[in-house]
Amino acid sequence: MLHNDIFNFLRLGTYVERADYTLRTVYSKYHRLLPTANVIGGSESQSQWEVMLRSLSAWRSLNWLKKGRIDPFSVADFLIFDQRMPRSINFCYYEVVSNLTDLARLYKKEYKSLDLARTLCCQLKKDRAKNIHKIDLKYFITEHIIKNNELGSIIADDFNFV
């Protein structure tokens, strides 16, 4: 496939939707990322994380990286910040910026969606610098679901998809 504007639009849709799916999956399993005293380290907690990670095609990768020692914070860190994981929020936003940059260069125009995507990437870098233990995860995920939807709407406006 040619790497032209059609390719960029396909990839934009892929990564905006992928970020949304990851965010919503983590949000729906949020309570499982906060283990109770009777579940911590048990087979039940491991199976809960495994199911969530498998739904995002992330189980094998994280298990390999952590050598089988998976905890709630490593799951959240991996799915949100790890640039090596194609379904992580960080990876998706990086790809959105890359494809919007290609479109801006091709059409010789700046777009609001590119500014927002860059802002989201910068915010993720700042949040990554914080310890994952210090982030209010539920608020963080909720905010990014809203911002991701806003990004999709602005992309639609910028390129007259509405």
What is each of the regions a protein language model found here?
Residues 1-162:
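Alpha-helical transmembrane segments and their helix-helix packing motifs
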